[in-house]
Amino acid sequence: MRMSSYGKRKGATFETSVVKWLRLKDILAERLTKAGAKDEGDVVAFLDGTANILELKATKKLDLPQFWREAEVEAENYAKARGLKEVPYKFVIVKRRQAGIDKAWVVEDFEQWTKRAGK
């Protein structure tokens, strides 16, 4: 599905805003280059030296299964491109309408959540 230039601009603005917000919190973060089928996510953020792949969505329509599939594929691409043994944690960040970055929703699956909890 092709995205309109307005949609691309909206997404790019959200990505830039998220990176700036993370940096204000002293979290190392950067936007990742778009690479089509080899896309590695929208943003990488490092927490305690660990890469976290963020798939950002600024859309009216929520399609969490599709968003999550994208995050999984892109985290795998990130790991492959860098020769990492483990795929980084991945998250879908969904912009809430008429709300700031700090009110965005963060989505992950329960399996990853329990892994992060050390279980």
Q: Which residues fall in each region the model found?
A:
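Catalytic phosphate/metal-binding cores of nucleic-acid and nucleotide-processing enzymes, i.e., regions
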Residues: 1-119
